[in-house]
């Protein structure tokens, strides 16, 4: 009797277990049109990853809704889609960690030791892919090193050229300060670059203005020397001019200037030489004329 009761309890246990397994299988079965099999992108250590609490919560909610009816089935499909997205993202991060560990030559230990050998094939394929990636990336790394070295050399050359240019500019400005007045006096501190250039500009403009005034004066003197000495204005002015010329011959250059204001002739004979000018006036002694006294 007890044995029959035990068999009945065992049959009931197995039946309930199989029913639970079927319900779990139906809950985890992907809907139509959704393919979760991605052997190329899955992590080789996906069998060691622990379940995500959020995924378990979603599965529990989905199982509860599946038992309630068709509305629960629709929620299960949405939950499975979200779970698939989370699992893909998690597997992508795991694959990235594994590729980094394999490229660095280290070995990543699994926290669990109860593996049943289902990931061996995936591990081998991932190892082959990692080795192929290392072989392909090796020339790229060499080329990147050469490129960075060339860029560093180019940057150093540009910096050296700019440094030489600044040194030449500073030397030129120092030479300019040395020749400009008021730029190197003890009471004035060292001028800046802009102040030096402005002072040089003003100094050049001042020199140009002075040169222009000098040219006008020379032209005026040349024009006065071309006028004939016959245009002496009046006897008094002629006497004063003759006396001035007798005292100093260089003052004869200013005689035509007076004639410009008085263009009328006085009727006096033209005197071209110093003795003739001295002979025109009897009241002026010829001994005062330097040219007459210097002649033998």
UniProtKB/Swiss-Prot annotation:
Region described as Disordered: 26-70
A GO CC term attached to the entry: nucleus
Any Pfam family the entry gives: HLH
Main subcellular location: nucleus
Annotated keywords: Nucleus, Repressor, Transcription, Transcription regulation
InterPro entries listed in its UniProt record: bHLH_dom, bHLH_transcription_factors, HLH_DNA-bd_sf
Intracellular or extracellular location(s): Nucleus
Signal peptide (residue range): none
Molecular function terms from GO: protein dimerization activity
The bHLH domain, residue ranges: 153-207
Function: May act as a transcriptional repressor.
PANTHER family: BASIC HELIX-LOOP-HELIX PROTEIN NEUROGENIN-RELATED, CLASS E BASIC HELIX-LOOP-HELIX PROTEIN 22
Protein's recorded name: Class E basic helix-loop-helix protein 22
Organism, scientific name: Xenopus tropicalis (Western clawed frog)
Lineage of the species this protein comes from: Eukaryota, Metazoa, Chordata, Craniata, Vertebrata
């Amino acid at each position: 009797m007890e044995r029959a009761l035990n068999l009945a309890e065992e049959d009931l246990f197995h039946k309930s277990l199989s029913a639970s397994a079927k319900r779990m299988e139906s809950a985890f079965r992907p809907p139509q049109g959704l393919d979760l099999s991605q052997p190329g992108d899955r992590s080789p250590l996906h069998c060691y990853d622990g379940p995500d609490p959020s995924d378990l919560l979603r599965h529990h909610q989905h199982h509860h809704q599946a038992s309630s009816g068709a509305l629960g089935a629709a929620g299960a499909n949405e939950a499975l889609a979200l779970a698939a997205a989370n699992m893909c993202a998690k597997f992508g991060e795991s694959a990235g960690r594994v590729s980094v560990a394999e490229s660095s030559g280290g070995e990543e230990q699994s926290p669990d030791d109860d593996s049943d050998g289902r990931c061996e094939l995936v591990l081998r394929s991932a190892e082959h892919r990692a080795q192929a990636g290392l072989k392909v990336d090796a020339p790229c790394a060499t080329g990147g090193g050469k490129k960075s070295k060339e860029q560093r050399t180019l940057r150093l050359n540009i910096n050296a050229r700019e440094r030489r240019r600044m040194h030449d500019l500073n030397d030129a400005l120092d030479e300019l300060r040395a020749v400009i007045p008021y730029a190197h006096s003890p009471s004035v501190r060292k001028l800046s670059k802009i102040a030096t250039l402005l002072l040089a500009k003003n100094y050049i403009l001042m020199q140009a203005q002075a040169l222009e005034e000098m040219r006008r004066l020379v032209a005026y003197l040349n024009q006065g020397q071309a006028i004939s000495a016959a245009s002496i204005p009046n006897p008094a002015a002629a006497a004063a001019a003759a006396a001035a010329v007798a005292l100093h011959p260089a003052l004869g250059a200013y005689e035509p200037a007076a004639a410009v204001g008085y263009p009328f002739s006085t009727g006096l004979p033209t005197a071209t030489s110093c003795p003739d000018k001295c002979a025109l006036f009897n009241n002026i002694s010829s001994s005062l004329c330097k040219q007459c006294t210097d002649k033998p």
